């Protein structure tokens, strides 16, 4: 099993033809994933993950120092569900909309069971009575598994600048 490389560059271990076959699957996944989040359907977010998933948001500086302490850490779909419910039902935040923009995914590895991919993202936030601002930017480092014809995230490491 390949581990996710969270900093620096490593060449893809997938040839161009195979990467071209896998890229549309990962793109479709990411488009649907962001559509759920951007539409405010936060409680549907955990369905994109396996039961034994890992989800973490970490600053690039921490990732480069191999100190994956981050803003968010969730292990398992139930933990993601708790987080999603807390976010969707809290009243402590001003009303806002979020908009994700993603690069094309880079397929970095595959072993028959998993697909490893990276994708740059920018997250914009618009408060009801304010301008749109850049909220976060960085890279998704993903481990996908197949669930029939669909993909699920076994691991998503969100490294932000």
Model-derived regions, located:
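Hydrophobic pocket/interface hotspot
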Residues: 33, 45, 80, 117, ...
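A generic "alpha-helical surface" signal
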Residues: 24-27, 71, 78, 135
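Surface-exposed helix-capping loop/turn segments at secondary-structure junctions
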Residues: 36-44, 93-96, 149-150
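A solvent-exposed, acidic/Ser-Thr-rich amphipathic alpha-helical stretch
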Residues: 51-120
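Short helix-to-loop capping/linker segments positioned immediately adjacent to catalytic or ligand/cofactor-binding
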Residues: 33-35, 88-95, 128-131
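Short, low-complexity N-terminal intrinsically disordered segments enriched in polar/charged residues
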Residues: 2-39, 43, 47-51
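Short coil/turn segments at secondary-structure junctions
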Residues: 13-17, 64-67, 71, 128
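A beta-strand edge to alpha-helix "cap/lid" segment located at domain peripheries
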Residues: 2-11, 98-101, 106-161
């Amino acid at each position: 099993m390949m581990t996710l490389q969270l900093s620096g560059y490593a060449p893809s271990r997938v040839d161009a033809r195979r990467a071209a076959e896998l890229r549309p699957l990962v793109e479709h996944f990411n488009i649907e994933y962001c559509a759920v989040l951007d539409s405010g359907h936060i409680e549907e977010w955990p369905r994109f993950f396996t039961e034994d998933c890992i989800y973490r948001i970490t600053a690039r500086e921490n990732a480069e120092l191999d100190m994956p302490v981050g803003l968010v850490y969730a292990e398992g779909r139930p933990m993601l569900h708790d987080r999603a419910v807390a976010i969707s039902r809290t009243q402590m935040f001003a009303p806002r909309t979020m908009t994700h923009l993603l690069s094309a995914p880079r397929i970095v590895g595959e072993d028959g069971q998993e697909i490893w991919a990276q994708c740059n993202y920018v997250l914009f936030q618009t408060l009801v009575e304010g301008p749109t601002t850049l909220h976060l930017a960085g890279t998704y480092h993903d481990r996908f598994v197949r669930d029939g014809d669909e993909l699920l995230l076994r691991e998503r490491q969100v490294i932000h600048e």
